Amino acid sequence: LLTAVLGELPPGSSFVRFMFFDPLARERIVNWEHFAAASVAALRGELGRHPHDGLLVALIDEIRTRDQDAATWWNHHGVQDYASAAKRMVHPVVGELSFDIETVMLPHNTDQVLVAYTAQPDLGTARKLPFLASWSVQGSDRP
């Protein structure tokens, strides 16, 4: 359903790249600043665990270079592990969507993280998702 909500991410992309480099992220994610700052703090935490990971270092450098907000948050030296959160998004067809997010580090491989989005019922997100899923299957491009 990610594609139905946010559109197709380019091959080889990541959600972090989408957050900082695709203008659609700032339009669709209502609490973008909160999630972007938390993403920077999580990247700092990952760098502490994997200081010699060249791909991670390159990603962090790219984000800090291309996005002034990311550079500012990086300089605050915040570190954040993955945690529970709520994310609100706006879709141009169905309106606001609200999700609870649970992040779990897998016990046998702490380098892999399971992120589960569940629909918050108060905004009717659960009712809107089947429509978005069927709309996405029909091959619509992101609006």
Task: Give, region by region, the residue ranges found by the protein language model.
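Hydrophobic protein-protein interaction segments
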Residues: L2-P143
